[in-house]
Design a protein with these regions (language model features):
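Register position in tetratricopeptide repeats
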Residues: 50, 91, 125-126
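Canonical positions in the second alpha-helix
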Residues: 71, 104-105
Length: 134
């Protein structure tokens, strides 16, 4: 009788525990893409930049850029990726390459708001105001 009781208790507890673990979130949902990770780094970098912590911002931009390059290799010619590639490259001081990424993105989507805005900022910083007005 005692054996049956403990066996029943054990089976009941196993079933209860099993049902809870089956419903728990194991974190096996969709993984973030390199692009998504890069956007997170860019957003983090912008916050550090706003606070004046330029060294941390630079490191985040560098991490974002590496992920964006990888993303662009895997899925080439996506305007959003090219926009962020231009942005991170510009933020890291390479205006010429940043401009190339922006122009490549505009060739695909001439009305891309982000690219047009950031390219305008690049033109202002590089003292080409006439191009920024376009």
């Amino acid at each position: 009788m005692i054996k049956k009781f403990f066996l029943s208790l054990f089976i009941t507890l196993s079933l209860i525990t099993g049902s809870y673990s089956a419903s728990s979130d194991t974190g096996n949902g969709p993984k973030k893409t390199d692009y998504d990770k890069a956007v997170s780094f860019v957003n983090s970098a912008k916050k550090f930049e706003k606070k004046g912590n330029l060294e941390k911002a630079k490191k985040r931009y560098e991490k974002a850029q590496k992920l964006l390059i990888k993303s662009n290799e895997n899925k080439p010619n996506k305007p959003n990726t090219l926009n962020y590639l231009g942005f991170t490259t510009r933020k890291l001081g390479d205006f010429e390459l940043g401009e190339k990424y922006y122009l490549q993105g505009l060739a695909i989507d001439p009305n891309h708001v982000g690219i047009n805005e950031y390219l305008g900022e690049l033109y202002v910083v590089t003292k080409r105001h006439n191009l920024a007005i376009e």
